[in-house]
């Protein structure tokens, strides 16, 4: 939108100045005036006078004043006549800048208030001043007053009257036809500082906005106050600098100021002037010396509180929750910082672990002395026990081929150390038979003598010890004790049965009163410390992984139940082996624990022994979750020998009691309910039914005799134990064909093809990465 404003006549009141100058484009304009004239100040009230005839002449180089008017105080009045246009080439440069500011101001106001330029054009109808207006104004006799003050007062009175009497339609009709002789007056729309003749539409716009956004009474009061302040401003305005368009000099002052000084003084002037924060829009539209920033900051800024709800209170409201959120934010930041620090520490620790692993592997590979090799191997073993995550780095460093070559050296100590570290890394030798052979023993306390009878019969048929018959032995509670005695310590069955009976008599002998007190105190009827002492003496404090030093030792595991990880119990496996890097078992476990700790944790039956705390975990009897560990043993074997088929799995029970009595009661007691829950949790037949249906024929063998009496777990009387043995022998006699079939399977040797395949695999593992002929 382009607006052309043509100002025909400007009358300047100048005081005590000799000359002033300006610039029009590149040419300098000099205005020659009398010695006495009024000085221009944009703070004071400046009025616009219209005359009927032109009294000043304009040319490119000079402007000469041809008419002087003197007031009662004998001050000279210099009347300067300048025809200016925002698009005309003859306008002063500074005034043109101000006209462009007015234009940009109108654009901003139109966008902020009316919303479109079309509405702006329809509402703001501009009228170009003409000679008719000049004659109308001159007829009023505004310039006939004897002094300036009276002229200003008459201007105020006239403007107030014209604002009340005239309307937009009357003003429009007056400009349309002057010769009709109507008494309609032309609008003189004044502002408080500098007058700009934009017509009745601006007055209507200002009045409408002020009435909508402000209190009318408050605006009228502010208008009267400012009008009263205008009078002393005219009398006392002698030391204030002129407007940016005019430079003045006092008679007793120095040389005239140049244009640069004028600009610097004009820029410093607004800082010292008090400007109201809320002014009418007509004031901003009529002030060419103020820019768009003043409009937005002063007037539009005053409208924002009307459009929004108290913006000053919003920061306060935001600060209050922010203050309350400060502790939460600090806690979150502290937690985040701790998490980052822990993560960084883990990364640093992981890097240091990997570097340490590489250093140990490289040191071992550089060693040639067998004794020094043993030391290096043990150092690497201890390192991997403490940091199992380093096994992957060791495998990448080709530690397995080097260890397999070391195992060929005729040194028993070195071979034992190499077997231990190979088992820790997860490397395993081929199975003993044609496939994987698994032995799983249920829990049941002293009723484990029933399982001993089955094993005795199996040894008689195969003529081999148990640890040579099976590749993997797993047990729960009393089954873990049997697995350790048979698989790790290679005890004969007679010695094992004698030790088993002695353990029962030593542990399960307790006074009823003392046991009841202990039960209420530690939830354990028997003394757990006595049981731990017996285990340390009989089993020892060797680590589980150290049993892998024996070349005839099978893979052995004991199962316990962790009760403090989550809401549901979880099975935990104490192993004498490790899984190969990249192989993940579904069950928790480790091989860095002592053997007596494994048995203690696996046999911590609730009510009999106290739960066992190992590290951060709380262990109880494994029978609470998996009283039949056959499925767990099968899963572990698939992790150890993933490419080897299953030859057989033998599951040994400790006897089950089935009552034929049927109760006719319609309800059960709380004790009965709890007993049913425990029985269902420790049930072993469901796993048997599942495996029997899933596994191939002649692969799964379950031996669990039915006993005629419900014998408790802590039965230590010899007659009761003899009764259990007798019932077990009768059961084996009834299943003699089944036992013979199992013995035949366990007695089979590997085929020649399997032996060749195992030899090729061993050679390929020993010389991995080396030329083909070196493998032969």
UniProtKB/Swiss-Prot annotation:
TM ranges: 469-489
Alphabetized CDD domains for the sequence: Pat_PNPLA8
Modified residues (N6-succinyllysine): 730
Motif (GXSXG): 475-479
Keyword set includes Cytoplasm: no
Region annotated Disordered, chain positions: 226-274, 306-331
Residue interval(s) of motif DGA/G: 621-623
Chain positions of motif GXGXXG: 443-448
Membrane topology of this protein: Single-pass membrane protein
Domain PNPLA: 439-634
Activation/inhibition comment: Calcium-independent phospholipase.
Single annotated GO MF: calcium-independent phospholipase A2 activity
E.C. designation(s): 3.1.1.-, 3.1.1.5
Catalytic residues as annotated in Swiss-Prot or TrEMBL: 477 (nucleophile), 621 (proton acceptor)
Residue ranges with Basic and acidic residues bias: 226-238, 307-331
Compartments in which it is found: Endoplasmic reticulum membrane; Microsome membrane; Mitochondrion membrane; Peroxisome membrane
Listed InterPro entries: Acyl_Trfase/lysoPLipase, PNPLA8-like, PNPLA_dom
Pfam families linked to this entry: Patatin
Keyword annotations of the record: Endoplasmic reticulum, Hydrolase, Lipid degradation, Lipid metabolism, Membrane, Microsome, Mitochondrion, Peroxisome, Transmembrane, Transmembrane helix
GO CC terms in record: endoplasmic reticulum membrane; membrane; mitochondrial membrane; mitochondrion; peroxisomal membrane; peroxisome
Pathway where this protein functions: Phospholipid metabolism
Catalytic activity: a 1,2-diacyl-sn-glycero-3-phosphocholine + H2O = a 1-acyl-sn-glycero-3-phosphocholine + a fatty acid + H(+); a 1,2-diacyl-sn-glycero-3-phosphocholine + H2O = a 2-acyl-sn-glycero-3-phosphocholine + a fatty acid + H(+); a 1,2-diacyl-sn-glycero-3-phosphoethanolamine + H2O = a 1-acyl-sn-glycero-3-phosphoethanolamine + a fatty acid + H(+); a 1-O-(1Z-alkenyl)-2-acyl-sn-glycero-3-phosphocholine + H2O = a 1-O-(1Z-alkenyl)-sn-glycero-3-phosphocholine + a fatty acid + H(+)
Superkingdom of the source species: Eukaryota
A GO BP annotation: prostaglandin biosynthetic process
Role played: Calcium-independent and membrane-bound phospholipase, that catalyzes the esterolytic cleavage of fatty acids from glycerophospholipids to yield free fatty acids and lysophospholipids, hence regulating membrane physical properties and the release of lipid second messengers and growth factors. Hydrolyzes phosphatidylethanolamine, phosphatidylcholine and probably phosphatidylinositol with a possible preference for the former.
Name listed for the protein in its UniProt record: Calcium-independent phospholipase A2-gamma
Native source species: Rattus norvegicus (Rat)
Species classification: Eukaryota, Metazoa, Chordata, Craniata, Vertebrata
């Amino acid at each position: 939108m382009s607006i052309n404003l043509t100002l025909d006549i400007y009358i300047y009141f100048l005081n005590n100045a000799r000359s002033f100058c300006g610039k029009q484009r590149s040419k300098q304009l000099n205005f020659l005036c009398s010695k006495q004239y009024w000085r221009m100040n944009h703070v004071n009230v400046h009025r616009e006078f219209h005359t009927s005839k032109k009294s000043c002449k304009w040319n490119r180089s000079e402007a000469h004043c041809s008419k002087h008017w003197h007031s009662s105080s004998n001050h000279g009045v210099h009347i300067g006549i300048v025809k200016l246009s925002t698009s005309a080439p003859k306008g002063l440069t500074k005034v043109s800048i101000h006209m462009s500011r007015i234009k940009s101001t109108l654009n901003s106001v139109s966008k902020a208030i009316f919303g479109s330029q079309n509405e702006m054009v329809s509402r703001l109808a501009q009228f170009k001043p003409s000679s008719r207006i000049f004659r109308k104004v001159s007829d009023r006799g505004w310039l006939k007053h004897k002094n300036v003050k009276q002229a200003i007062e008459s201007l105020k009175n006239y403007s107030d009257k014209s604002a009340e009497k005239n309307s937009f339609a009357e003003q429009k009709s007056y400009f349309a036809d002057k010769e009709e002789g109507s008494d309609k007056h032309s609008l003189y729309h004044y502002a408080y500082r500098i007058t700009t003749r934009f017509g009745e539409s601006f007055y209507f716009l200002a009045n409408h906005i002020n009435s909508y956004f402000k209190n009318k009474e408050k605006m009228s009061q502010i208008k009267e106050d400012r009008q009263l302040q205008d009078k002393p401003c005219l009398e006392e305005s002698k030391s204030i600098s002129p407007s940016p368009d005019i430079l003045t000099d006092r008679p007793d002052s120095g040389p005239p100021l140049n244009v640069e000084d004028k600009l610097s003084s004009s820029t410093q002037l607004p800082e010292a002037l008090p400007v109201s924060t809320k002014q009418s829009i007509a004031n901003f539209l009529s002030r060419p010396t103020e820019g768009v920033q003043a409009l937005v900051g002063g007037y539009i800024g005053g409208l924002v509180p009307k459009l929004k709800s108290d913006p000053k209170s919003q920061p306060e409201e935001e600060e209050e929750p922010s203050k309350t959120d400060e502790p939460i934010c600090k806690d979150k930041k502290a937690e985040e910082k701790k998490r980052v620090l822990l993560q960084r520490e883990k990364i640093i620790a992981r890097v240091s672990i990997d570097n340490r692993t590489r250093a140990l592997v490289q040191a071992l590979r550089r060693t040639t002395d067998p004794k020094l090799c043993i030391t290096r191997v043990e150092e690497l073993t201890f390192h991997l026990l403490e940091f199992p995550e380093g096994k992957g780095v060791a495998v990448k460093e080709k530690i397995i081929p080097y260890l397999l070559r070391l195992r060929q050296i005729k040194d028993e100590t070195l071979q034992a150390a190499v077997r231990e570290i190979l088992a820790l890394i997860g490397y395993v030798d081929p199975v003993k038979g044609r496939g994987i052979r698994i032995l799983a023993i249920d829990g049941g306390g002293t009723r484990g003598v029933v399982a001993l009878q089955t094993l005795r019969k199996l040894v008689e048929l195969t003529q081999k010890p148990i640890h040579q018959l099976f590749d993997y032995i797993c047990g729960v509670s009393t089954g873990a004790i049997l697995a350790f005695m048979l698989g790790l310590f290679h005890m004969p069955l007679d010695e094992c049965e004698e030790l088993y009976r002695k353990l029962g008599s030593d542990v399960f002998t307790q006074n009823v009163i003392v046991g009841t007190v202990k039960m209420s105190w530690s939830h354990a009827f028997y003394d757990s410390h006595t049981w731990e002492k017996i285990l340390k003496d009989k089993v020892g404090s060797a680590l589980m992984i150290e049993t892998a030093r024996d070349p005839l030792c099978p893979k052995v595991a004991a199962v316990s139940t962790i009760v403090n990880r989550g809401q549901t119990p979880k099975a935990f496996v104490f192993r004498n082996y490790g899984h190969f890097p990249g192989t993940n078992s579904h069950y928790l476990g480790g091989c860095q624990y002592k053997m007596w700790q494994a048995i203690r944790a696996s046999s911590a039956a609730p009510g009999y022994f106290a739960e066992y705390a190992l590290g951060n975990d709380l262990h109880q009897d494994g029978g609470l979750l998996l009283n039949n560990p056959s499925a767990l043993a099968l899963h572990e074997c698939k992790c150890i020998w993933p490419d080897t088929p299953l030859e057989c799995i033998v599951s040994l029970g400790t006897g089950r009691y089935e009552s034929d009595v049927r109760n006719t009661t319609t309800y059960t007691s709380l004790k009965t309910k709890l007993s049913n829950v425990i029985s269902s949790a420790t049930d072993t037949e469901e796993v048997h039914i599942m495996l029997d249906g899933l596994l191939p024929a002649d692969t799964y063998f379950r031996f669990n005799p039915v006993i005629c009496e419900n014998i408790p777990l802590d039965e230590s009387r010899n007659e009761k134990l003899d009764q259990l043995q007798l019932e077990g022998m009768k059961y084996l006699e009834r299943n003699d064909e089944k036992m013979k079939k199992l013995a035949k399977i366990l007695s089979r040797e590997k085929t020649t093809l399997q032996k060749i395949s195992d030899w090729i695999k061993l050679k390929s593992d020993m010389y991995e990465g080396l030329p083909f002929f070196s493998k032969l």
